[in-house]
């Protein structure tokens, strides 16, 4: 007596074919948001099942709104969400960089290099990059810090709000910054009130 198949109307991929399909899924996701990258990035018009629309060029918003079933694509979205939770920026760059790394890894696999060897190479590259960052870092003034904050705010609201948000954000961070410049963002509490303007926002110590 033969056993009934558990998964009907499905196909199974193994080996190099499965690896290629996984990389293709990651690359497709990266390509979907590539045009949103940078200060001149394009907006995406998102429409949900109920017909509601959202215009944004925020990478993590686009990815989390998309209905993706592929497990590797979901991993890429989770990576972007983690980047957003920790750094609050760089979500699009994270996905694009991961996609390019996978694409380059695939080219090396086609040349006969084992995936574990490629993974070791990426880990060594990470160590080298961290060393380079330590060597080229420099102190920044308030003007440069403000510019960095404004850049991260691009596409997240009207440009007229950026000056105010950048100023109060820097003030809040400087209030909680430790002696070694470490910052515990849990010490910053946001309290919002209905009505008024963004320009009315203020920073208070000790609440």
Give the role of each language-model region.
Residues 102-143:
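Hydrophobic or amphipathic alpha-helical targeting/insertion segments
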Residues 92-93, 116-120, 163:
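Short, solvent-exposed positions on alpha-helices
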Residues 50-84:
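Glycine-rich oxoanion-binding loops at beta->alpha junctions
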Residues 31, 78-82, 100-107:
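Short glycine/serine- and small hydrophobic-enriched flexible loop segments
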Residues 13, 83-93:
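Glycine/serine-rich anion-binding loops at beta->alpha junctions
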């Amino acid at each position: 007596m033969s056993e009934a198949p558990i998964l009907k109307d499905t196909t199974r991929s193994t080996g190099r074919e499965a690896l290629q399909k996984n990389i293709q899924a990651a690359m497709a996701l990266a390509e979907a948001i590539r045009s949103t990258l940078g200060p001149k990035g394009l907006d995406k018009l998102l429409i949900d099942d109920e017909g509601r629309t959202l215009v944004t060029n925020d990478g993590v918003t686009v990815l989390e709104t998309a209905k993706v079933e592929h497990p590797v694509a979901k991993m890429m979205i989770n990576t972007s969400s983690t980047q957003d939770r920790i750094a609050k920026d760089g979500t699009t760059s994270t996905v694009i960089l991961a996609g390019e790394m996978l694409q380059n890894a695939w080219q090396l696999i086609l040349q006969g290099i084992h995936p574990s060897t490629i993974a070791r190479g990426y880990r060594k590259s990470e160590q080298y990059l961290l060393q380079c960052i330590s060597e080229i870092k420099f102190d920044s003034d308030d003007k440069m810090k403000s510019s960095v904050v404004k850049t991260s705010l691009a596409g997240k609201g009207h440009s007229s709000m950026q000056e105010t948000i950048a100023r109060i954000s820097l003030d809040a961070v400087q209030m909680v910054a430790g002696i070694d410049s470490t910052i515990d963002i849990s010490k910053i509490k946001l309290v919002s009130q209905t009505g008024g303007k963004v320009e009315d926002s203020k920073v208070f110590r000790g609440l």
